Amino acid sequence: MAFTMRAPAPRATAQSRVTANRARRSLVVRADKDKTVVIGLAADSGCGKSTFMRRMTSIFGGVPKPPAGGNPDSNTLISDMTTVICLDDYHCLDRNGRKVKGVTALAPEAQNFDLMYNQVKALKEGKSVDKPIYNHVSGLIDAPEKIESPPILVIEGLHPFYDKRVAELLDFKIYLDISDDIKFAWKIQRDMAERGHSLESIKSSIAARKPDFDAYIDPQKKDADMIIQVLPTQLVPDDKGQYLRVRLIMKEGSKMFDPVYLFDEGSTISWIPCGRKLTCSFPGIKMFYGPDTWYGQEVSVLEMDGQFDKLEELIYVESHLSNTSAKFYGEITQQMLKNSGFPGSNNGTGLFQTIVGLKVREVYERIVKKDVVPV
C-alpha cells in the first residue's frame, strides 16, 4: 500500500472548512414533515442517469416500476419512497415538430418550462398532477398520466436547473459530468453494438447536439451541490474508455450534507490501496482526496482512478472513508454487491453513485427531522 498525505495548509480557509463541517453535523433543519423533498439530476443523454436512479431507489427499498395501469411507454418510475420523472416529458415539441423548426431536444424553445415549474411545485406541495408523456419510441407526446406526490421526487434530464423557478424548488442538485472522450466511447459502444448505428451517424449526431449541449446543458453543472465527473484514466493509455478516473466534487458550506473525506478531513491525500487487503490487477487503483475550487466555489474532491477486482474487498476502502451517510459499517459495500450487475459497479462511477444516493437519503432525513448519525 502506497500512501502520501499533505496536512492542511496553515490558512484560515482550510481550518474554517473543517470547523464549519463539524458544526453542521448537529444542525437540525426546520421543515414540514409531510413536504415532498425534490432532487434534481442533470446530465446529457447516455450519461448513466438511469443506472444512477436504479442505485438510488435501491437504497430506499422497493423495485421501481411505471405507474400502475399507465402507458407502457411511460418514462416515470415509482418505488416505495421515490418517484422519478423524466424531464423529456415536458418537451413542447414532438420529434417532427423539432425537425420542422430545426431545433434539437436540448434547445430551451423545445421545452414547456411553465408546465414543468407548475407541476413540480404542485407535487412538492403534496398535490397530484396530470403529467404529459414524451414517447421515445414514436417521438410523439402521449396522453397525460396521473402522478401522486411522493416522499422523494427526483426530476432527471437535460434541464432541471436551467429554469430558475424550477431550480429554486430543488432541495439538492446533482450533475453527471462525462468528458467528451468517454461520452463518445460509451455512445459508440451503445449505439453500434446495441442499436446497429454506423460510426458516421454517431459522429454526426454528437456534432449536431454539441452546440446546444455547450450552451444550455453543460453550464448547469456550476449550480450543482455534488458532481460526479468521469474522465479518462491517468494510469495507462486507454482510447476506448475501458478504465475511468472518476471524481466526486462536493460543495462546501451546505446545510444539507457533509462532504465525504478520506483519512483526514481538510488534508490532501494520495493513496494506492492495492496490497494484502485489496486485490488490484491491471491497471491498478489510485485514490485522491483534497480541497479544490469549482467555478469559484470551495469544494472537496474524492477521486478514484482504476477498477476493483473483487467488490467484497471494497469494505477496505470504505473503512477509510468518513461522512459517507451510511447507516452502518459496510453499507456501501453491501449496496455495491447488491447491484453488482449494474454498469460501473467495478469502478468509481458505481461507488460514487452509491455514496451520492446515501447523501440523498441524508438530505431527506434532515428535512423531515429524522436523526442522522454520520459514519
Curated annotation (Swiss-Prot):
Q: Where is the transit peptide?
A: 1-31
* SUPFAM superfamilies per UniProt: P-loop containing nucleoside triphosphate hydrolases (SSF52540)
From the UniProt record, list the reaction(s) this protein catalyses: D-ribulose 5-phosphate + ATP = D-ribulose 1,5-bisphosphate + ADP + H(+)
Q: Give the highest taxon in the source lineage.
A: Eukaryota
Q: Which Pfam families match?
A: PRK (PF00485)
> What EC identifiers does the entry list?
2.7.1.19
Which protein family is named in the record? Belongs to the phosphoribulokinase family.
Q: What is this protein called?
A: Phosphoribulokinase, chloroplastic
Q: What is the name of the gene encoding this protein? A: PRKA
